[in-house]
């Protein structure tokens, strides 16, 4: 597995590896070089979620062993290459949708994008949400993922 995982390092652009390193560092709250259940719980709580033990275990099961940076890169490299399925994108938004309304406050989403991870600029934000389905300040992520993935399905 390590051989396959280290091959990821040669496939990804240096900038992307650096961004992933920053993301990993944010998630590795206790700074031990591995992401564990406590790290996932802490980062989730910082994002306003309180996942239960079962959810945290499911997240960690994606890795075939301890989740160090190389394994983290390996797992997420496919996602970085733009191969996320519509369902994967929808599930990513759903993590922030505790009431399961299929809609999120647009200001909350913009705040996340401006202040975490990629740090979107105002221009990037405008382009991203130019055609986004927003009604009454609520961002419809089901319609949005259908739009960007081209399925044409408006309902899940």
UniProtKB/Swiss-Prot annotation:
Annotated binding of Ca(2+), by residue: 28, 30, 32, 39
InterPro entries: EF-hand-dom_pair (IPR011992), EF_Hand_1_Ca_BS (IPR018247), EF_hand_dom (IPR002048), Myosin_RLC (IPR050403)
Gene3D superfamilies xrefs: EF-hand (1.10.238.10)
Gene Ontology molecular-function annotations: calcium ion binding
UniProt keyword list: Calcium, Metal-binding, Motor protein, Muscle protein, Myosin, Repeat
Other noteworthy facts: This chain binds calcium.
Function: In molluscan muscle, calcium regulation is associated with myosin rather than with actin. Muscle myosin contains two types of light chains: the catalytic light chain, essential for ATPase activity, and the regulatory light chain, a calcium-binding protein responsible for Ca(2+) dependent binding and Ca(2+) dependent Mg-ATPase activity.
Protein name as it appears in the record: Myosin regulatory light chain, striated adductor muscle
Organism: Mizuhopecten yessoensis
